[in-house]
């Protein structure tokens, strides 16, 4: 199967101008937005963790746990160059963790300590950012806060895992180059109380191939404006259709992350009943069904999938706008259904409803805008590029409303480090698909979003657009959350 090549007429034709400044009751696997410290939230009794066995998550090679002690997961990651054969059996140089793209699947239980011995065998500095994890800012992988790992050097990341969910890891130095070259991987934190079902992992990416090469080091005008959109679709580092066996009459949990530099994607499932049960890893009190699930850059969706009675195959497909108002479908996984058991009802996941937001005691505003043309585009927050920015200073453990206003007429998948938030409203509307806790949200052209958070995790935290070229060109700032 040849790699899918995307038709970009829709995005290329966009003229960007810059303006001035009866569902089942689910079960809990991640904390609600309460007053608990993140290092305490969601932890389980150590005996329970010790007795629990990590589920098998199919689709990705797992990292080797070097420590068999209960409550500790210890792995090694090495960033280096490697080669893959994505085009005509020719070698393409990539950057890889442990020689593979994506990197190995890291798994642990909520409450475990994760210890990662990282070695940088690249010829430039790098870090590892743990996207979505509420950990210490000293382990967050941001170079303004901790020193990057220099070529030939090593560093050990170590932290407790306060929250269950689907997360991922990637560098935070020249991120647009490093992620495009292949430095990315999934991290799954399990709650022993979760319903035991078959789990599958899908890391969805697109890369811009120039013949047999990837060369993200320079940005033309289109990449500066829209971000780097690829012409080859990868799922779990493969260009071919993934296949597996799926049992009839059973539910599965599919964990999906969009690790692309810039492309918003949608996903859908064929020959199955399916619904979204978690966003950014956190289980929803009320899962929802949609025709296609929106998956912005950096975000994660967990799907519950049940094969239809009599189905011979179940498929996952990525859907992309076709430039005419419709969608083109790209099949990426085909599961052959075995057995003849009848389809069950929906699983009761048991996530509790979130507590009602308390009255806001402080507010922050993030205005997203850009200016320039040709090959000198700047993307800004509150009229400032990163490095010349004014941090947002906020008190920890305080009900907070953060307003995000997009003045650029472009879309921005916006990510907050170190915190969870919920979407109060989008352009004055409360939408079912905006439910739950998350760390990333898609802000579309001219959107006005209000986010609610209680800032449970003190520290210096990045807030930025996850279109990696936008971030590289300035659309980053800091939130200083003080005790």
Which residues does each PLM region occupy?
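Acidic-aromatic/histidine active-site loop/patch
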Residues: 199-250, 257-260, 371, 377-384
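N-terminal edge beta-strand
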Residues: 84-110, 230-245, 373-399
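Sec-dependent bacterial lipoprotein signal peptides
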Residues: 1-19
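Extended terminal and domain-junction accessory segments
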Residues: 50-76, 179-213, 285-411, 454-460, ...
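Hydrophobic or amphipathic alpha-helical targeting/insertion segments
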Residues: 153, 157-194
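Ser/Thr-rich, Pro/Gly/Ala-heavy low-complexity intrinsically disordered linkers and tails
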Residues: 1, 20-51
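Extracytoplasmic beta-sandwich strand-turn segments characteristic of Greek-key/jelly-roll folds
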Residues: 101-108, 114-117, 130-163, 239-244, ...
């Amino acid at each position: 199967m040849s790699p899918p090549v995307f038709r970009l007429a829709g995005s290329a034709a966009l003229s960007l101008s810059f303006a001035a400044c009866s569902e089942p009751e689910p079960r809990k696997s991640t904390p609600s937005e309460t007053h608990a410290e993140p290092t305490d939230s969601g932890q389980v009794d150590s005996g329970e963790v010790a007795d629990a066995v990590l589920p098998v998550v199919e689709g990705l090679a797992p990292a080797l746990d070097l420590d068999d002690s209960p409550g500790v997961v210890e792995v090694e990651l090495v960033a280096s160059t490697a080669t893959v054969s994505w085009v005509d059996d020719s070698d393409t140089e990539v950057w890889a963790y442990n020689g593979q793209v994506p990197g190995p699947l890291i798994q642990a239980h909520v409450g475990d300590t994760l210890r990662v011995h990282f070695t940088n065998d690249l010829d430039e500095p790098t870090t590892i950012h743990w996207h979505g994890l509420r950990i210490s800012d000293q382990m967050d992988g941001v170079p303004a806060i901790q020193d990057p790992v220099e070529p030939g050097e090593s560093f050990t990341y170590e932290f407790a895992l306060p929250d269950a969910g689907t997360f991922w890891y990637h560098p935070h130095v020249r991120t647009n180059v490093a992620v495009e070259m292949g430095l990315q991987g999934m991290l799954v934190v399990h709650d022993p109380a979760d319903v035991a079902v078959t789990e599958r992992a899908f890391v969805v990416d697109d890369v811009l191939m120039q013949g047999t090469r990837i060369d993200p080091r320079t940005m033309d005008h289109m990449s500066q404006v829209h971000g780097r959109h690829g012409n080859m679709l990868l799922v779990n580092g493969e260009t071919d259709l993934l296949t597996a066996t799926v049992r009839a009459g059973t539910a599965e949990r599919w964990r999906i992350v969009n690790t692309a530099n810039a492309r918003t994607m949608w996903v859908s499932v064929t020959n199955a009943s399916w619904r979204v049960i978690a966003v950014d890893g956190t289980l929803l009190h009320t899962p929802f069904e949609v025709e296609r699930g929106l998956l912005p850059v950096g975000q994660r969706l967990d799907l519950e999938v049940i094969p239809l009675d009599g189905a011979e195959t179940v498929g996952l497909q990525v859907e992309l706008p076709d430039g005419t108002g419709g969608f083109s479908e790209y099949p990426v996984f085909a599961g052959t259904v075995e057995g003849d058991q009848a389809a069950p009802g929906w699983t009761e996941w048991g996530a509790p409803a979130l507590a009602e937001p308390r009255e806001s005691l402080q507010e922050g505003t993030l205005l997203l805008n850009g200016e320039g043309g040709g090959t000198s585009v700047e993307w800004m927050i509150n009229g400032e590029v990163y490095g010349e920015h004014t941090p947002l200073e906020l008190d920890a453990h305080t009900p907070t409303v953060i307003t995000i206003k997009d003045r650029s007429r472009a879309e921005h998948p916006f990510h907050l480090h170190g915190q969870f938030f919920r979407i109060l409203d989008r352009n004055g509307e409360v939408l079912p698909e905006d439910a739950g806790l998350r760390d990333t949200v898609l802000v579309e052209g001219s959107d006005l979003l209000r986010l609610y958070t209680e800032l449970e995790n003190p520290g210096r935290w990045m807030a930025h657009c996850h279109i990696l070229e936008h971030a590289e060109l300035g659309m980053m700032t800091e939130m200083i959350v003080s005790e």
